[in-house]
């Protein structure tokens, strides 16, 4: 597998709809000229933004977190330009961008250093071959203080790995009817 460059990312987004909406360059300021956490195409990746849709984890129901029987009541829904994550807690969000991953590509998501240096960790599982949808993002606040996440700004970087032509997967995410195929909002655990 080889990592793909900005040239390849632009081609796949603009000619094949791999990322929508798509920003071919790096955006570092908003419309009023204020500096923001950058998003868009980088040298070997794509920096995604999160939408204004957040689910903030709370333990008001004193529940046990169980991925097989997840209690939706464990989250507070928030729609805002800023999400404040409680200390030592987490929040879910989704990307603004919708992805359509080709059969010969695997995408790895890494957090942006701006957030990592503040103790905010981004966790996303790989975007598998032929998966499509908005990416559900998990932000962990590892600090003992509240932490902010900004909507419509960069939050994570996607790295695109392309398989050699003779080594394309036999079974894609679409082939096996993956449970998160086509997700459009912040998606909670499914079994």
UniProtKB/Swiss-Prot annotation:
Keywords: Hydrolase, Nucleotide metabolism, Nucleotide-binding. It comes from the Bacteria. The keyword Nucleotide-binding applies. It is an enzyme of class 3 (hydrolase). CDD domains: trimeric_dUTPase. Homotrimer. This is dCTP deaminase. It comes from Xylella fastidiosa (strain 9a5c). The gene is dcd.
